[in-house]
């Protein structure tokens, strides 16, 4: 949303039982669609949309270990190019100097930093994965939209999406898309108080 106030979105891939990571904190279940052309096109279109990417430390480390590699460039050239070129923010109290190109570190006052960024004009911000960051920013009512990609697998254990919210947060379903590989993407917007 260039020229206006920024919007903050979260994109999360979850299992049928609402988990974004399995019991070993792995997210490989979310990448079973890699060979599916329709899903690959959807992901490439998302990456081409631009904006600013935001991550927590764990997700950042996973992304930074994959996207800058020759293997990523060969497997998914369009997505790799965009992921490496886009501006990125990593929220971490332990990371001292991010190595991935175009990355800014936020080491304290995440809520205040995001609140200030949203009050400025500029490109929209999208959180990828990063469950604890999503929960913190949703609790502070800073997330405007949530995009949930449901993968057709039940994990039985692991980290659940939006776990630990101290109060209910109402969202409105805006649209859905069903993929031939069995995945479903749901787009929600935060419901404004009446």
Language model: regions and residue ranges:
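Enzymes that bind and transform nitrogen-containing heteroaromatic metabolites
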Residues: 1-194
């Amino acid at each position: 949303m260039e020229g206006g106030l920024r919007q903050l979105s979260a994109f999360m891939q979850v299992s049928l039982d609402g988990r974004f990571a399995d019991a070993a904190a792995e997210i490989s279940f979310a990448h079973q669609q890699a060979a599916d052309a329709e899903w690959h096109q959807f992901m490439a279109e998302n990456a081409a949309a631009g904006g600013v990417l935001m991550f927590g430390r764990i997700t950042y480390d996973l992304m930074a270990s994959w996207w800058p590699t020759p293997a990523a460039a060969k497997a998914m050239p369009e997505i790799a190019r965009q992921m490496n070129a886009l501006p990125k923010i990593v929220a971490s109290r332990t990371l001292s100097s991010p190595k991935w190109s175009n990355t800014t570190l936020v080491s304290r006052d995440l809520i205040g930093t995001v609140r200030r960024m949203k009050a400025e004009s500029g490109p929209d911000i999208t959180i990828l994965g990063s469950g604890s960051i999503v929960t913190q920013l949703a609790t502070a009512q800073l997330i405007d939209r949530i995009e949930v990609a449901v993968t057709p697998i039940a994990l039985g254990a692991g980290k659940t999406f939006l776990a630990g919210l101290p109060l209910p947060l109402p969202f409105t379903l805006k649209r859905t898309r069903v993929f031939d590989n069995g995945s479903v993407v749901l787009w929600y917007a935060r419901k404004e108080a009446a």
